Design a protein with these regions (language model features):
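Glycine-rich beta-strand-centered segment in the early N-terminal region that forms part
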Residues: 36-51, 65-114, 128
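NAD(P)H dinucleotide-binding glycine-rich loop of Rossmann-like/cofactor-binding domains
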Residues: 71, 109-192
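C-terminal hydrophobic helical "lid"/dimerization subdomain
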Residues: 177, 257-265, 271, 284-291, ...
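Hydrophobic/small residue at the entry helix of a nucleotide-binding pocket
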Residues: 201-202
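ADP-ribose/adenylate-binding Rossmann-like module
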Residues: 275-280, 291-310
């Protein structure tokens, strides 16, 4: 039985914070709570940003039935949000050799302490991203999952968690060698890769990583069924830029006549793909992913379904004779997160393309509960301010009457329509 973390604390409560907590199925509430005093094994943090993940929506849908949400969440509600970044506020005596007040941090929520599924953002009463302050659980500290973050660009720190999931997916791909039982991990360098349903926020991150990581394909095909989203992806990650990197990049709307499975295979010269990642839990997409695999092709089912009975057909002849295989990943590890932080802070990747909306802590409940119905990519929350959920695309119009958005519109124009460090600094200084 999974019980809420932090409930055994006996110290007096002394710091008040606003936080969004889950009480049950589709029951999220913005509340003011008190945090326990910082003890010798505690680290208290000030949270600046949190990006809302579809996994939080899934947790809201399932409530206590979710594998990370405690069974007693109705009696001991927990704070949601697990893609967060900020500044260390206070450090307990036993951790002063490792952490310092004023130091930036990012957090790897999946600590897996002693095999536990507990994680900040799901399982703890006093730690989650959709709060102003929080006390980091001892399990996170023991597993080295509170990571130093040496940057003042907080949204990058928030995006290091979703980017680590993408990086972990690439690392989890595997291939075989005739006569050997050892798997060769990672995508095929110089191989043929397809990213299906891949112009949502996670798909955009995958395009960025595929183009700029240390092991790249020679052919990259990105599919979706939405022309507008495909066009946005192509304007950010251009065919010309990919060509400069030695990669042949194609964007394909598979809903259009002639852009079917046969066409996708033709783009490979008929061999099929070495690596395919599926970003939608939709049966036709999953089956297409299997059908375009080549010899020893690896399919990663990245998209997590909420339906526990979700099934799709797979060509088992090809499994036997062509060594096709499937892997599923749902998150990265701490090293993946370190890689994400390093690549972002060094300028190798820019996951700002994932963000299409910004908002304050007051926007979290409605945004999370309606997440599947809100078009666009990542919804980025700044937890220390109040701001309605606002699309970056609406800055220009809002700026006609609001000087804040007029300036943000000017800044985003200079950054190819993307959220940026400059925009973040201006927002936090003026809101």
């Amino acid at each position: 039985m999974l019980r809420a973390g932090g409930g055994d604390r006996k110290e007096s409560l002394n710091m008040k914070t606003k936080a969004v907590r889950i009480h049950g199925k589709m029951d999220l509430r913005l509340e003011e709570i008190e945090l326990p005093q910082v003890g010798p094994d505690d680290v208290q943090v000030k949270i600046i940003s949190d990006s809302i993940c579809m996994s939080t929506y899934k947790a809201a849908v399932e409530g206590a039935e979710h594998k990370r949400v405690p069974d007693d969440v109705a009696e001991h509600p927990t704070i949601v949000g697990h893609e967060f970044c900020g500044v260390i506020q206070e450090v307990g005596e036993n951790w002063k050799n490792k952490y310092k007040p004023g130091q930036g941090f990012a957090i790897q929520p999946a600590h897996f302490y002693k095999g536990s599924q507990m994680a900040p953002g799901y399982s703890y009463q006093y730690c989650g991203g959709d709060a102003q302050y929080g006390n980091v659980p001892i399990e996170t500290l023991l597993m080295d999952c509170l990571l130093p973050y040496n940057s003042d660009v907080y949204f990058y720190g928030s995006l290091s968690e979703p980017m680590s999931c993408i990086i972990g997916t690439f690392h989890a791909m595997y291939h075989t060698k005739a006569g050997s039982y050892e798997h060769q991990m990672g995508i095929v360098e110089g191989g043929k890769m397809a990213l299906l349903a891949s112009v949502g926020p996670m798909g955009l991150g995958a395009i960025d990583y595929a183009l700029h990581c240390d092991r790249r394909p020679s052919l990259l095909v990105v599919t979706d069924i939405d022309d507008e989203r495909l066009a946005r992806a192509e304007s950010i990650y251009t065919v010309e830029h990919a060509k400069e990197l030695g990669i042949e990049l194609h964007y394909v709307n598979t809903a259009k006549p002639g852009c079917d499975t046969k066409y996708l295979r033709e783009l490979t010269g008929g061999t099929g793909y070495d690596d395919v990642i599926c970003f939608a839990p939709v049966r036709p997409v999953v089956e297409q992913a299997g059908d375009i695999l080549g010899y020893d092709g690896c399919l990663n089912f990245f998209a997590g379904p909420t339906n526990k009975e979700f099934k799709a057909e797979f060509n088992w002849y090809n499994v036997h004779y062509l060594y096709t295989h499937v892997v599923g990943t749902s998150g990265g590890n701490t090293n993946d997160m370190r890689e994400a932080i390093d690549m972002m802070t060094s300028g190798k990747i820019n996951p700002a393309a994932m963000i299409t909306h910004i908002g304050g802590l007051n926007a979290v409940v409605d945004t999370t509960l309606n997440l599947p119905n809100i078009r666009g990519g990542k919804k980025l929350i700044y937890t220390q301010i109040e701001l309605p959920l606002t699309a970056i695309a609406d800055f220009e119009k809002l700026g006609e009457t609001d000087p804040l958005f007029a300036k943000l519109a000017e800044i985003t124009r200079r950054h190819n329509g993307l959220w940026s460090a400059e925009a973040e600094k201006y927002l936090l200084a003026n809101k």
